[in-house]
Amino acid sequence: MAKKIVTDLELKGKTVLVRADFNVPMKDGEITDDNRIVQALPTIKYIIEQGGKVVLFSHLGKVKEESDKAALTLKPVANALTEKLGEEVTFVPETRGETLEQSVKDLNEGDVLLVENTRFEDVDGKKESKNDPELGKYWASLGDVFVNDAFGTAHREHASNVGIASNLETVAGFLMEKEIKYIGGVVENPDKPVVAILGGAKVSDKIGVITNLLKIADKVLIGGGMSYTFFKAQGKEIGLSLLEKDKVDFAKELLDRAGDQIVLPVDCKVAKEFSNDAEITEVSVDDIPADQEAMDIGPKSVELFKEQLQGAHTVVWNGPMGVFELSNFAKGTIGVCEAIAELKDANTIIGGGDSAAAAISLGYGDDFSHISTGGGASLEYLEGKELPGVVAIANK
């Protein structure tokens, strides 16, 4: 179902509430990665150009008690927005009250205001995270329309997304629209053939995704730590490699059901320790030494996965192929990333999380059709679940 977007509204003179995702990594009060702020700019700039008054909401981190607040204020985000927009962004260090209400009333057309971290409301009864109806109603009372542009929290039913939406006309911002188009498109109406590449440490994190993608994808390539549970299910010895014993039966059932639809690595890199100084050996997946751990897929597996990608019209990737943080065990992830980036005629999508960070850090950010800003939200969407934040947006 197509959703209404910000361009469907008349915004001039309106107070436009925007739920953005400014949950950025911070160190000593400094933002270390501003990607989420950059991604929010097109929607904010459009509302400014249309003569709307922008009131921004976002969470940052987890706020459990009063002492958490100082390190999790959105003030650095307000400063970053001021710099990127080239105009002063008013920061209100409160989530409710007269100062906030008056500051909103004082806005002129084209002005931007950022409300303090919505999760400050969690200190007293988790009002944000539990979608307190009074809080959602109060925030909604500050504006005329609501634009939800925070895909990263779309799988959560919070006061600042679903709560406001239940009290105010709600549309998608440009980033949310893009996420629905690409991530939702994989699930609902993909351009075939579809190849999915899944990595990461645990099968348990991806059970729903694997199960759903096997209904959609022509091939599901599995790498990373989770692949060794599948090898165990095939009766292979995996040495000290990562194993989820309680998921071996599930992996066996999937392999029996899916047949050659699931493609596993054929070789891997093993070592005795997690270290860039460790002695590395490339071995067949049939020859993993008993005293060593597999930490990356090998070069033959990268070539195999490249072959499987040829001719794909849609590719979705979620999860690294090895211990990407260590350069010794990053080549599998780099190889897969490069192979996908070279597919110029395919829809290439990264489902957030570590694979997104890998692609961006390797300089391939612009070579993918879409890199999702949502980790958990992307996974739940790929599982085929309805996301509360998306459901709450008005249909066209």
Curated annotation (Swiss-Prot):
PROSITE patterns registered for this protein in UniProt: PGLYCERATE_KINASE
EC class of the enzyme, as a word: transferase
Signal peptide start and end residues: none
Gene Ontology BP terms: gluconeogenesis; glycolytic process
Single GO term (MF): phosphoglycerate kinase activity
Swiss-Prot/TrEMBL catalytic activity: (2R)-3-phosphoglycerate + ATP = (2R)-3-phospho-glyceroyl phosphate + ADP
UniProt KW Cytoplasm keyword: yes
Binding, substrate: D21, F22, N23, R36, H59, L60, G61, K62, R119, R156
A Pfam family per the record: PGK
Domain of life from the UniProt record: Bacteria
Record-listed E.C. numbers: 2.7.2.3
Keywords carried by this UniProt record: ATP-binding, Cytoplasm, Glycolysis, Kinase, Nucleotide-binding, Transferase
Chain residues that bind ATP: K206, E325, G352, G353, D354, S355
Disulfide bonds: none
Places the protein is found: Cytoplasm
A cellular-component GO term for this protein: cytosol
Pathway: Carbohydrate degradation; glycolysis; pyruvate from D-glyceraldehyde 3-phosphate: step 2/5
Matches recorded under InterPro entries: Phosphoglycerate_kinase, Phosphoglycerate_kinase_CS, Phosphoglycerate_kinase_N, Phosphoglycerate_kinase_sf
Quaternary state and interactors: Monomer.
Family membership noted in the UniProt record: Belongs to the phosphoglycerate kinase family.
Protein name per Swiss-Prot or TrEMBL: Phosphoglycerate kinase
Species per Swiss-Prot/TrEMBL record: Staphylococcus saprophyticus subsp. saprophyticus (strain ATCC 15305 / DSM 20229 / NCIMB 8711 / NCTC 7292 / S-41)
